[in-house]
UniProtKB/Swiss-Prot annotation:
<dbReference type="GO" id="GO:0009507">
    <property type="term" value="C:chloroplast"/>
</dbReference>
<dbReference type="GO" id="GO:0003723">
    <property type="term" value="F:RNA binding"/>
</dbReference>
<dbReference type="GO" id="GO:0006397">
    <property type="term" value="P:mRNA processing"/>
</dbReference>
<dbReference type="InterPro" id="IPR002866">
    <property type="entry name" value="Maturase_MatK"/>
</dbReference>
<dbReference type="InterPro" id="IPR024937">
    <property type="entry name" value="Domain_X"/>
</dbReference>
<keyword id="KW-0694">RNA-binding</keyword>
<dbReference type="Pfam" id="PF01348">
    <property type="entry name" value="Intron_maturas2"/>
</dbReference>
<dbReference type="Pfam" id="PF01824">
    <property type="entry name" value="MatK_N"/>
</dbReference>
<keyword id="KW-0507">mRNA processing</keyword>
<keyword id="KW-0819">tRNA processing</keyword>
<keyword id="KW-0934">Plastid</keyword>
<dbReference type="GO" id="GO:0008380">
    <property type="term" value="P:RNA splicing"/>
</dbReference>
<dbReference type="GO" id="GO:0008033">
    <property type="term" value="P:tRNA processing"/>
</dbReference>
<dbReference type="InterPro" id="IPR024942">
    <property type="entry name" value="Maturase_MatK_N"/>
</dbReference>
<protein>
    <recommendedName>
        <fullName>Maturase K</fullName>
    </recommendedName>
</protein>
<keyword id="KW-0150">Chloroplast</keyword>
<comment type="function">
    <text>Usually encoded in the trnK tRNA gene intron. Probably assists in splicing its own and other chloroplast group II introns.</text>
</comment>
Amino acid sequence: MEELQGYLEKDRSWQQHFLYPLLFKEYIYIFAHDRGLNGSIFYESAEIFGYGSKYSSLLVKRSIIRMYQQNYLIYSVNDSNQNRFVGHNNFFYFHFFYSQMILEGFAVIVEIPFLLRLVSFLEEKKIPKSQNLNLRSIHSIFPFFEDKLSHLNYVSDILIPYPIHLKILVQILQFWIQDVPSLHLLRFFLHEYHNWNSLITPNNSIFLFSKENKRLFRFPYNFYVSECEFVLVFLRKQSSYLRLTSSGAFLERTHFYGKIEHLIVVVVRRNYFQKTLCFFKDPFMHYIRYQGKAILVSKGTHLLMKKWKCHLVNFWQYYFNSWSQPYRIHINQLSNCSFYFLGYLSSVLINLSAVRNQMLENSFLIDTVFKKFDTRVPVIPLIGSLSKAKFCTVSGHPISKPIWTDLSDCDIIDRFGRICRNLSHYHSGSSKKQSLYRIKYILRFSCAKTLARKHKSMVRAFLQRLGSGLLEEFFMEEEQVVSLIFPKLTSFSLHESHIERIWYLDIIRINDLVNYS
């Protein structure tokens, strides 16, 4: 980020807050590649044309030279659409590759104002960079749950509505990006996206292009979600005597992430022409969101949560001109329900404990209530995800993976083992890890059936010939991983590893098999 700031300080066009001229700057594409922001297109796509990786910068320069030509973008897209059935026409590949390269650079450009806002926010709050990296872990939210949710009463499970038209997204961006050519170019890309998306064919090279251009088209939706959260800060500013403890918005690679603590509940009356605002101060309210799902928890009453629900529905309707169904917001009492978030089924358990109290010659038994935040793995939905991925049937019976039979034995075992270890790593915070045994069983026998199908033998005969230990080393248990990380913790027994929850700070995205909501 410091390198990009150094380039922008020297660039006169950026000093006048113009984004469009940055599209012709070579350092934008170099920055996109060096930072790992979908940079694979600069190497993998170059190999399709027969170039090595050392020619990637040459392709960038050629693309910039062609963009100086009048109406190049329009001709490039039209040529791509007209030649979609030509086959392996190099003319088609070159034009399509240049278009995708422009997309990669433009995706970085439109994020620059918000990245700089993030840097200024971190400098203002004096947040060290190392702590900023920890904020990227989605598992860091669960320790926050453990500290706060046991003292709260109600939870609102919210599904943020999707905007009905992309034009609304561009209109929202106009408040933050005043560069008109950049907005027109963004509108052009969004309009032509459906044509490019229709180019998905079994050909791996074409699928690569379609897979790599999602970053730009996620950006308007992520900004729309951020605007939905911005109303909380906006309404707080309308009430000068009510103080918001802390608020912040963090721009990550693919998702906006915001966590606001101690919100001030502000509900606008139905008569929007009145200037009277009805304030409900609730210092014990917390808001958490990931992607399009949000959780709003409060210590207040059920009436307060219903007012929040009414407020959110009206806000989406009048501000974004989109109808939001009230059933997308569920209000439940924490002690009587479980809510799904980030692949975990979370709830607040109530434990009763009898405490003996001795007072002089009399003794009393006092019943004490303890609330504990609990997280478990929803096994049935996870089996459904494995079924969609063709690892098992709907009922959970393991099946072979025919598409992987062309791979070597080591590659097959490595793929299954990596999936199993990633699931165990992601669900390390579950209080009952025994529920993952069924998932590991499905993956192990699916791997064995795939290998047996490749060698045209029965599963039992294949395992007897090579031994069941063939698969064990590729499915390392979580307690063995913990023992490698913390070798001095000799008291960490096998039984305790299935009870204690472990949250890792290296998980920056939800697991693909877990993202089934």
